[in-house]
A protein has these predicted regions:
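Active-site core segment of subtilase-fold serine proteases
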Residues: 150-211, 228-230, 276, 365-449, ...
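Subtilisin-like serine protease catalytic core
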Residues: 10, 129-260, 277-281, 308-310, ...
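C-terminal subdomain of the subtilisin-like protease fold in secreted/lumenal serine endopeptidases
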Residues: 42-45, 248, 279-288, 292-295, ...
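Surface-exposed, proline-anchored Ser/Thr-rich loop/turn motifs
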Residues: 640-669, 679-684, 707, 725-729
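C-terminal tail/sorting-segment detector
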Residues: 9, 688, 707-729
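Autoinhibitory N-terminal propeptides
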Residues: 7-134, 142, 159, 243-244, ...
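N-terminal domain-start motif of subtilase-like serine proteases
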Residues: 20, 26-47, 90, 109-163, ...
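Hydrolase catalytic cores
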Residues: 214, 236-243, 270-280, 310, ...
Length: 729
């Protein structure tokens, strides 16, 4: 065993740094030491000497001087927090500046499409929920989506007539059109001609995620039943960097793509909305695991600064709901543990306790081989960094453990435990870890690898599927969205039935991540349908990957302007998140000054509850499933008016004709007479009219009413006819 010691002529202040920044700084210091030894200090030590990191930097005073002296470029400011491009070689010196309080960056995200569905080779379709009211369509609201894999030419992003193009602005952070670009990375495109000429995001041949999520949030539906929520909204997009895009980025620029770069993307969308004096909601279907380092503290503060009246950010909870991610060893219990499996470099857990305890690693070949580490020994190491290379039987392991104070409670110590080997861990040779110490209360969080069971020791079976909400959905500044399920299968474009059963009736999809957050807050905030969703798919991805597995989940192919496009079925919190964003676009049309807190209040008052035995909000469903229509009634202030139903009639369609008469279309001729009441949005009854039975179409003359929004209430003994809707005339 040995404790790491980082010797350097100038030792960085690691306490100011997030994990990624600290790791990059250590690398720079090691490079510097190597240069001194080899006598090459005056020469470029390696190519990464010119690399830059996009980071959040909190500076209490004299920021301009600090950045100038350390060759940093300020990209955006939010009070005392800046997004800055920092040369890697300046990280140590920057951390030693007395006015610099924190330097924070984190690697980019993964997508939140349900990976289990791909593994099962089954991606069903869900065509949508109840019809939306005619009065609210998202008109005048900016729907922003930051994602990857955009087909900018898909007819779903025109209006319903495929005439008017709705994408107003697009920043591709991976674009190589950088010669005249004013953007930190990539390039921005504006207007119909420029965006359609660009055609697809740079990763559009290998990704199509954003084409799908954008369609859910704001697609017009183009000759289909698959219309999005805010289908008349204005669209502003950012194509960012995610895991899977590595081949598209020069290694010299790899650290320019971080959470801070994503924050610039959010700002880009919000700035567009502000410039045009429009309310804005942003959908973000990506994320990464939480931590106890506080690696997203400044990120949260920046997103909070970007939010406010008419400015709302929505993010997906993640798809780890079926993954064992947490266990708790209470005081009085001697030990608790689990078997683990994973890639050679991806077995990683985080432990949290206010008391000392013992960690036991066991490798099982012909017999048990045990290695034990006491937390007291970890804390005695320089910077509380412990590293040991140990042979257990015929297999060699490297154990790296870092101890530090929790960013949420300084009385609690946290230990990041990583296990490495030259080959996969836990497969050919079973491997377990165990927490020992009857006097310690210890919480264990999975960060990498899979927790399993093995008959070699049936005691070691700890783990529950909780505490797996991803960041930024876990942040207090963001509305986090989980996913519910309705349908269990589709027939694809080849006529094949493809089952994928995650339940029916609005039950939580088992994949949908579960709270609480690492600091104990309830998440997710809200649910929406996320299983079996049909939306647009990229023609460029289809053209490049005609045999890809996900193409088997296309439900239809069609031609538009000489290209073949698709409607595709998909599942995950990636799909539920844009549904909530699009719904909030309708709410913002009704009340453009809505805040996140206002929206949470709407959830609390109007969400539906699948499991009525639970108390809401909770860590499985949040406040429940969003009810778009009931939320609109609540926002307009008519939800409590006696005589107005809180649901729309499921057997009726409404159409406002050019002569300002409302056509009421029933699915079948009415067997009973019914009445129609017209209310103002202040709740005043304006008119009541009765209609005789025997017809399937009726006309209500509203030509004498001033232009505006009205509540139309149908009263009938037929439950499919009874209900209310909102009509704009």
């Amino acid at each position: 065993m040995f404790c790491t010691v980082c010797a350097s002529a100038q030792h960085a202040n690691y306490a100011k740094m997030s994990t990624m920044v600290r790791q990059l700084t250590l690398q720079q210091e090691l490079i510097g030491r190597q240069g001194n030894i080899e006598g090459t200090r005056s020469k470029p030590i390696c190519s990464n000497q010119s690399q830059e990191l996009c980071a959040f930097v909190k500076v209490s005073k004299d920021a301009q001087r600090v950045f100038q002296e350390h060759h940093c470029k300020s990209l955006a400011q939010f009070g005392d927090i800046f997004i800055v491009s920092v040369p890697l070689r300046q990280l140590t010196k920057l951390s030693l500046e007395k006015y610099v309080d924190r330097i924070e960056a984190r690697r980019s995200n993964g997508l939140h499409t349900d990976s289990l569905a791909y593994c099962l080779d089954a991606m069903p379709v869900y065509a949508g929920t109840s019809p939306l009211p005619q009065a609210y369509t998202g008109r005048g609201v900016v729907v922003g989506v930051q994602d990857v894999g955009f087909d900018l030419t898909h007819p779903n992003f025109f209006d319903a007539t495929a005439t008017n193009y709705r994408i107003q602005r697009f920043w591709d952070q991976l674009s190589v059109d950088t010669l005249k670009s004013k953007m930190y990375v990539g390039a921005s495109y504006e207007g119909r001609a420029e965006i359609l000429t660009y055609a697809h995001s740079r990763d559009g041949l290998i990704q199509t995620h954003g084409t799908h999520t954008l369609g859910i949030a704001a697609g017009s539906g183009y000759n289909s039943a698959y219309r999005g929520m805010g289908y008349e909204s204005d669209i502003c997009l950012v194509s960012n960097f995610v895991v899977g895009d590595e081949a598209l980025v020069d290694s010299a620029n790899r650290y320019k793509y971080t959470y801070a770069t994503d924050a610039l993307g959010f700002k880009y969308i919000m700035d567009y909305a502000k410039y045009n004096n429009q309310p804005c909601v942003i959908s973000f279907s990506e994320g990464s695991r939480q931590d106890f380092h506080g690696d997203d503290v400044l990120y949260n503060a920046v997103l909070d600064s970007l939010s406010g009246p008419g400015r709302i950010i929505i993010a997906s909870a993640g798809n780890d709901g079926q993954v064992k991610s947490y266990f708790h060893k209470p005081i009085g219990q001697v030990g608790m543990g689990t078997f683990v499996e994973g890639r050679p470099d991806n077995v990683y857990v985080t432990l949290k306790s206010a008391s000392p305890f013992q960690i036991r690693f066991t490798s099982y070949d012909d017999t048990k081989h045990i290695h034990e580490v006491f937390t007291q020994d970890i804390l005695r190491c320089k910077d509380s960094i412990y590293v040991d290379t140990v042979r257990l039987g015929n297999k060699q392991y490297v154990f790296s453990i870092v101890g530090y104070r929790s960013c949420y409670d300084s009385a609690e110590l946290v230990y990041d435990v990583r296990m490495w080997s030259k080959s996969e861990i836990g497969h050919a040779v079973p491997f377990s870890f165990e927490i020992l110490g009857a006097q310690a209360d210890v919480e264990v969080f999975r960060m990498g690898g899979v927790w399993t069971v093995n008959q070699l020791d049936e005691r070691l079976s700890a783990g529950e599927c909780t505490h797996n909400i991803h960041s930024p959905a876990s942040l207090s500044s963001v509305i986090g969205v989980g996913a519910t399920s309705y349908r269990t299968g589709i027939t694809n474009y080849l006529g094949e039935w493809r089952p994928y059963n995650q339940g029916v009736g609005g039950v939580r999809g088992a994949y949908s991540s579960v709270g609480p957050t690492y600091d104990g807050r309830v998440k997710p905030d809200v649910m929406a349908p996320g299983t079996n969703i049909i939306s647009s798919y990229s023609s460029y991805y289809l053209e490049k990957n005609p045999k890809a597995n996900d193409i088997k989940s296309d439900v239809a192919h069609f031609e538009f302007n000489g290209r073949t496009y698709a409607w595709n079925s998909n599942a995950g919190t990636s799909m539920s998140t844009p549904a909530v964003a699009g719904a909030i676009a309708l709410w913002l049309q009704a009340k453009p000054t809505l805040t996140r807190e206002d929206v949470m209040d709407v959830f609390a008052k109007t969400c539906t509850h699948y499991d009525t035995s639970l108390t809401y909000p909770n860590n499985w469903y949040g406040y429940g499933q969003i009810d778009v229509y009931k939320g609109l009634l609540y926002i307009l202030g008519v939800s409590g008016v006696k005589g107005i139903s809180s649901h729309q009639p499921t057997g009726v369609q409404f159409e406002v004709r050019a002569d300002r008469k409302i056509e009421i279309k029933l699915k079948e001729p009415s067997c009973h007479h019914f009445s129609v009441c017209v209310y103002s949005t202040s709740g005043v009854l304006l008119e009541r009219k009765s209609f005789d039975a025997g017809f399937s179409s009726y006309l209500l003359d509203v030509s004498s009413y001033p232009r505006g929004v009205y509540v139309i209430q149908l009263n009938s003994s037929n439950p499919f006819v009874k209900g209310s809707t909102l009509i704009r005339i």
